[in-house]
Amino acid sequence: MDAQNKEVAALIEKIAGIQAAIAELPSLSPSPEVDRLFTDLVTACVPPSPVDVTKLSPEHQRMREALIRLCSAAEGKLEAHYADLLATFDNPLDHLGLFPYYSNYVNLSRLEYELLARHVPGIAPARVAFVGSGPLPFSSLVLAAHHLPETQFDNYDLCGAANERARKLFGATADGVGARMSFHTADVADLTQELGAYDVVFLAALVGMAAEEKAKVIAHLGAHMVEGASLVVRSARPRGFLYPIVDPEDIRRGGFEVLAVHHPEGEVINSVIVARKAVEAQLSGPQNGDAHARGAVPLVSPPCNFSTKMEASALEKSEELTAKELAF
């Protein structure tokens, strides 16, 4: 076995061991043991590695799928815990830095906006939808406060309790960012005419856990979004043990033109895919040598510097944020 194969085997074995330990936990609610295991997992998955999760053995693929579901459940419990904690403050939005990964949301949302601005010039959406917003809708909050100050945000989640927690966070800011936020308990598969109202739809990484589920969600969006509307999808190709991977071809088959694919460096975990609802002429096949229609993926570099190397301590606690980042 050559050195690279040994490295791949060692990493898969390590992650499988962490997955087994997480699966045996009596609860995924925040605790020292839960925090330790997930810190170990993220520390193992973030550095660049030669592992291609699409080529895992069936056994390891089942392990990966089980791990992603555990990550999803734990993330939900972590966000619910901190949503309840933040709700105890008179001004919850002044204390967002208490959440240990808040800085990651700041950087990810900035990245998504700058990719949109680069590939959809002049974009100034009146309404956007965020599908899979959860109890701590940090992404919508950062986008609304720092990048899209005139935009109305409709946040969708399957969980009514998650939406109730989110509403409490904005209750004290009804005349500010909160005035542009609404929360809806719904399955995206049940949305039809509503989707035609949005200039941009953001699809969270954990909406559609399996590849088939994700492709079905994207196809549904493609059937009901208006031509020219933008779709921002979170994927995780370099960190595919943490989140589902989205194949750009599934986005094309769903009726979209893929504008850009960005894989993260440093602290940002998720890959980002920016697409646009295609017009009928584009859906019929390649036109005038269109590279996107032929299937060429425009892999792009980051629009700003996100290449700072993450240190282990950043996984255990949030980096100290500037006053500007917390001023809502």
Curated annotation (Swiss-Prot):
Induction of expression: By iron deficiency.
Alphabetically ordered keywords of this record: S-adenosyl-L-methionine, Transferase
Enzyme Commission number, as recorded: 2.5.1.43
Summary of the tissues where the protein is detected: In roots but not in leaves.
Gene Ontology molecular function, alphabetical: nicotianamine synthase activity
Catalytic activity, reaction form: 3 S-adenosyl-L-methionine = nicotianamine + 3 S-methyl-5'-thioadenosine + 3 H(+)
Source domain of life: Eukaryota
Top-level EC class as recorded in UniProt: transferase
Entry's Gene Ontology BP terms: nicotianamine biosynthetic process
Family per record: Belongs to the nicotianamine synthase (NAS)-like family.
Functional description taken from the UniProt entry: Synthesizes nicotianamine, a polyamine that is the first intermediate in the synthesis of the phytosiderophores of the mugineic acid type found in gramineae which serves as a sensor for the physiological iron status within the plant, and/or might be involved in the transport of iron.
Name of the protein in its database record: Nicotianamine synthase 1
Organism of this sequence: Hordeum vulgare
Lineage: Eukaryota, Viridiplantae, Streptophyta, Embryophyta, Tracheophyta
Name of the gene encoding the protein in the UniProt record: NAS1
